Amino acid sequence: MKKIIYFASLLLICSNNSFAQKDKNKAQDNPLDKISLSGLSWRSIGPSLTSGRISDLAINPDKPFEYYVAVSSGGVWKTSNWGLDYTPVFDNESSYSIGCVTIDHNNTNIIWIGTGENNNQRSVAYGDGIYKSVDGGKSWKNMGLKNSEHIGNILVHPENSNVVFVSVYGPLWSKGGDRGIYKTEDGGNTWNKILYIDEHTGFNEIHMDPRNSDVLYAASHQRRRHVYTYVGGGPGSGLHKSTDGGVTWKEINKGLPGVEIGRIGMDISDANPEIIYAIVEAAERKGGFYKSTDRGENWVKQSSKVTSGNYYQEIFADPVDQDVVYTMDTWMAVTHDGGKTFKNVGEDFKHVDNHAMWINPNNNSHWLVGCDGGIYETFDSAKNWDFKENLPVTQFYKVAVDNAEPFYNIYGGTQDNFSMGGPSRVKTAHGITNQDWFITHGGDGFESQVDPDNPNIVYAQSQYGWLVRFDKLSGEEVGIKPIARKGELDYKWNWDAPLAVSKHKTGRLYFAANKVFRSDDYGNSWEVISDDLSRKINRNELKVFGRVLSMDAVAKNGSTSPYGTIVSLSESPIDSNFIAVGTDDGLIQITKNGGQNWAKIDNIKGAPSLSYVNSIYLSKHDINVMYVAFNHHKYGDFKPYIFKSSDQGESWESISNNLPERGSVYSIEEDHINKDLIFCGTEFGVFFSPNSGERWKELGNGLPTIAVRDIAIQERENDLILGTFGRGFYVLDDYSSLRSINDYYSSSNSNIFNVRDPLMWEKSMPLGLPGKAFQGDNFYSATNLGPVAMITYYHNDNFSSLKSKRQKSEKELIKNNKDVS
């Protein structure tokens, strides 16, 4: 058995983690598969400064201090102490995107999870069905509906734990799949589809009359998203009612808008179950807030209050006052008169973009609210808010590193939580805390870059190309976004515009919309070095639901980037004139003369048509080598598509090979020493190949199931850094041993790899004591790498320690009834 062991030593004290090898009988034929890498472990560094998007909350009715958090892109977390600490309980399952969580009130150890976020934004991820735990989240079992991709909500019968109803939203990016209202009567072992509309329509909510469990209400929603558009409604949307436990259903849309309807959010007033509220999205701005006082038979419009069905459109009725209802929206609003008027609740020191709410039935001034910035709690109806600053579920789109001494910094842009930076290591004895992080720009954050010669110059951006130059010393931001010249059409910016800092000339930047821009003065001025490099397709002529739709379709093109934009960009580290870009409509364009002429690369064999070019990468070692990753998940195709060219794009070969079939590729990175060692970030983890993509192996120890949107290498330290979409940043300290892994497939020798020069310092304690000091249990601290030496070594299957040799010898002596001496 071959093993690699990795450990850190501090003075004379050391610890080690073995790269335990799989059983030989289970080993696959490929030598790479036979080497386990469990000793190379990822280090989570947070941050938890701004947390991340929450889909749902489930509070234990018997012990309200215990609750579960469904994170949109970060798994499931549990607290048993009102949020003093949170523990991830879903990290090892096959999905990380969560739409809903439900506690069985008959047995609070039974927890149901619906995977796949139940919103329809551009940044949602997908799941693989329904999960169930019978031990309070310690273990999970997938209970089916694996082709649902997105789950709306889950209802457990109040008297029978075996009876469960599920609103199955179904695929967002394609037709078909599991969608409808499903019911189980055997605890999830089998499911019956009890309500179905069509292949384009799913259900986002189901509710039960608290007085009669046979009375059910359900909201159907027809929607579709692609790279080029979003359509948020259609003839399949509406309200439905059953009075026999779901055996039969009827539509209950009397009084609702007569035009096409979008998403509908519902709630039944526990204070007076005769009252049902609905917030209705509709075409032609005819939506509004509706009320029924006859169990859904008739609906009366109370006001024109609506939110976005793409991202919000959920309501929560107060459990005590029948006239009070809260709407989830950018700014949370409340009505005190049954929907006639609304006002914002007040969120002066709270993150906006709200999605989930719990109102304490015993004190309706006490709420928990889940939003894009994590979890907040109020005890006085939003006059004051407490932020749960210990939930590290930030969604990073991109990651970058600087060359600061002694410890480099890590930068990135987040979904709705700014662009920020922070240290890879700290000198204190407290770990990496929220106070160690700093904001470089506001808004949704995207690609950041750092001047390679001056780590105090940081480039950060928010959505649609709003680029700034941030001075780390002064805190000053200067806007440097390229603006269309006189007589030039406005540029088309992607939500996540690509940015690059030149490796050849100080102060040179590249940035892209539908055209490519170059600056030689740190962004103070820009030169346009290309025409529009997209296909120039009119997205309104493309089909949705199998046909071209009117511009008046519900929410058409809502929350969607302009179509025909550049989304990836790479400057050759070898030749400054060689630049490559990729577009959202499936084109690669290259220039070999600094932008004077561009050549189009199209129709790569094996690549889907019009596929999003998520990453384009020009080799650090060979001017002829290029890598490209296509991401086709917004057309319902989750396969990995990664290709290599060895002749500057003249020909291509697929190197997806043994990458998992389920998991689009987002990013590519190449080692700076070994030209054959490459990495790719996917929807479900990070993989490396020691042979340029011939064979891949996952680097998963210490990393939860999560999307890896971007990868960076800190070359001085040989560190690999991940930007994950829902669990912050992760660092693999000194991965250099992977460069030689090919040498040890058949070796019978042992080896100690080169040791990185360690740093030594005396840990400071600005808080007076090490660790959390006197800050309380909710003080967030991520794992720091202290003053240790990182040592990696390899040994063959004949290796054994002196202790194990002694024990083996003693065992034989004891067996033969001899003295152990």
Segments (PLM) and residue ranges:
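Bacterial Sec-dependent N-terminal signal peptides
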Residues: 1-24
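Intrinsically disordered, low-complexity segments
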Residues: 7, 13-16, 609, 786, ...
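Beta-propeller blade termini and top-face loops
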Residues: 21-779, 786-789, 796-798
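Short amphipathic, basic-aromatic surface patches that mediate peripheral association
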Residues: 777, 791-820
